[in-house]
Amino acid sequence: MTILFLTMVISYFGCMKAAPMKEASVRGQGSLAYPGVRTHGTLESVSGPKAGSRGLTSLADTFEHVIEELLDEDQKVRPNEENNKDADLYTSRVMLSSQVPLEPPLLFLLEEYKNYLDAANMSMRVRRHSDPARRGELSVCDSISEWVTAADKKTAVDMSGGTVTVLEKVPVSKGQLKQYFYETKCNPMGYTKEGCRGIDKRHWNSQCRTTQSYVRALTMDSKKRIGWRFIRIDTSCVCTLTIKRGR
């Protein structure tokens, strides 16, 4: 599992010339990308100039150490979602890249790796019974996730309720990078398009609906003013219920 994760991380950094987030304290403020950003460094700059000579085991240890530090730091700066109504502003669904990203956002991979570390501390029997596939678990609503560009979105709604134009390219020191958004929405071809899975239709009306959150993107308003604004994008598929009357 560790080797698989490292392969995903290496391919993630290798295939993209993407703008990195700023330090963790800035990420806690919902900042995702800014003008003048730089491209990702190489593995050498992350692990040191002699990392390759120490072999794959040393490289794996280095990545695990860095990832665990990132997860610890992320827990420190993550807002308290119960007390902060703006918690959905903190997202990692925006990427600046010269080509379509081949993997989900890095923080999504970190979350998966965190779950892997938690599972590693379980006994084999506990892991076997905690596997959703073994328990026959299914999602209440079927969803799909994919990277989309500003060319696909064209316009979006900002925090003031106004419609803004999403700019396709962002100027950086060495040229331009495209804005990509990782969107999650209800699957129109899924089995839950007629209602949520597992809901008693005798007593409830159900519907799978796409919900949105705010992310920061480079946009232009109706007065041709260009700037970084929070816009709404599709981020999840949830089940909504209404009770049937007259029963």
From Swiss-Prot:
Gene Ontology molecular function: growth factor activity; nerve growth factor receptor binding
Post-translational modification comment from the UniProt entry: Mature BDNF is produced by proteolytic removal of the propeptide, catalyzed by a FURIN family member. In addition, the precursor form is proteolytically cleaved within the propeptide, but this is not an obligatory intermediate for the production of mature BDNF. Can be converted into mature BDNF by plasmin (PLG).
Keyword tags: Cleavage on pair of basic residues, Disulfide bond, Glycoprotein, Growth factor, Secreted, Signal
Positions of the record's site feature: Cleavage: 57-58
Glycan-carrying positions: 121
Disulfide cysteine pairs (residue numbers): 141-208, 186-237, 196-239
Protein's UniProt keywords contain NAD: no
Proregion span(s): 19-128
Entry similarity comment: Belongs to the NGF-beta family.
Function: Important signaling molecule that activates signaling cascades downstream of NTRK2. During development, promotes the survival and differentiation of selected neuronal populations of the peripheral and central nervous systems. Participates in axonal growth, pathfinding and in the modulation of dendritic growth and morphology. Major regulator of synaptic transmission and plasticity at adult synapses in many regions of the CNS.
Subunit structure: Monomers and homodimers. Binds to NTRK2/TRKB. Can form heterodimers with other neurotrophin family members, such as NTF3 and NTF4 (in vitro), but the physiological relevance of this is not clear. BDNF precursor form: interacts with the heterodimer formed by NGFR and SORCS2. Mature BDNF has much lower affinity for the heterodimer formed by NGFR and SORCS2.
Name this polypeptide is given: Neurotrophic factor BDNF precursor form
